[in-house]
UniProtKB/Swiss-Prot annotation:
GO molecular function annotations of the record: toxin activity
Biological role: Anticoagulant protein. May prevent the complex of factors Xa (F10) and factor Va (F5) from binding to phospholipid surfaces and to prothrombin (F2). Also blocks the activation of factor X (F10) by factor VIIa (F7) and tissue factor (F3) as well.
Name this polypeptide is given: Coagulation factor X inhibitor
Domain of life: Eukaryota
Chief location category: secreted
Protein source organism: Deinagkistrodon acutus
């Protein structure tokens, strides 16, 4: 999915 917050995770 899209890395929210600019990191390599699917930010929540």
């Amino acid at each position: 999915a899209t890395p929210f917050g600019g990191s390599s995770y699917e930010g929540h």
